[in-house]
Design a protein with these regions (language model features):
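Beta-sandwich/jelly-roll carbohydrate-recognition scaffolds of carbohydrate-active enzymes
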Residues: 1-165
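Aromatic-rich carbohydrate-recognition surfaces in CAZymes
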Residues: 166-250
Length: 250
């Protein structure tokens, strides 16, 4: 069974639509929705604010496990379906394979730094914080490079492997995180610079805070500029350097 829908969150002028597709490995018995406590078992569509959602019922046996996988897109339901097929199609319904893949992807990042000495607790704290230092960078483009810009237009990235990121404002990352990212993962740092230049290409300005791939009034400083300069100073320059200078100067 496959269900699809969308949501429109609004916050700090960062309005955007999230489309999603959800697929389960067993046919459902029934489907329903609820809005602020009112349950409707006859409708597959619901509108409203606050407490709103949908549910599926199944005939199950004791101990039976039902698996569900989802994908999202900020472009369309069709794009969400494409993301689901590309990102999870190779795994089928093998949960352990998906988990192993996720573990290996994070291991690639965390293993860029090896520490010596200290206790197991010290190591656990270090790698937990290293993990957290990467968590606020969120990919907003689809597997084929499509995304919705700050003017609600669908754009196409030249290289889908270098995605557009919606994230916080790189707030005070010049104190330590810029250096960490550049030294530990220069390839990821380069992608972040490319993402900022994509904002400049389609919007005309670098974003102070790009949550939801929007221009946000969250702060008045330009903390993205020290990140771009830090990348350049460390030899991370696999992007249009002249365009980067133009964007920073503007």
């Amino acid at each position: 069974s496959t269900q699809s829908s969308y949501d429109e969150p609004t916050n700090l002028l960062n309005d955007y639509t999230v489309y999603f597709v959800a697929r389960v490995d067993k046919p459902m018995k029934s489907f329903g929705t609820w809005v602020n406590g009112y349950v409707d078992t006859t409708s597959s569509i619901c509108w409203g604010r606050h407490d709103i959602g949908a549910f599926m019922n199944f005939d199950t046996e004791e101990g039976e496990i039902i698996q569900l996988k989802t994908a999202i897109s900020y472009v369309s339901i069709e794009q969400a379906r494409k993301n689901l097929e590309v990102e999870s199609g190779g795994f089928g319904w093998n949960f352990d394979a998906v988990r192993k893949y996720a573990v290996n992807e994070w291991r690639k990042i965390l293993s860029t730094i090896e520490i010596e000495g200290g206790t197991e607790e010290d190591k656990r704290k270090f790698y937990t914080n290293l993990y957290r230092s990467y968590c606020s960078r969120t990919i907003f483009s689809d597997v084929d490079g499509q995304y919705v810009d700050m003017y609600e237009r669908t754009q196409q990235l030249k290289d889908p492997a270098s995605p557009i990121y919606g994230c916080d404002a790189f707030w005070n990352t010049f104190w330590n995180l810029n250096q960490l990212w550049a030294l530990a993962t220069p390839d990821i740092m380069n992608k972040w610079v490319e993402s900022l230049l994509e904002y400049y290409r389609v919007g005309g300005w670098l974003p102070n805070g790009p949550p939801g791939v929007e221009y946000c009034d969250i702060m008045g400083a330009q903390h993205e500029i020290p990140l771009m300069v830090s990348a350049y100073q460390k030899g991370i320059r696999n992007y249009d350097v002249d365009k980067a200078y133009e964007a920073v100067k503007k």
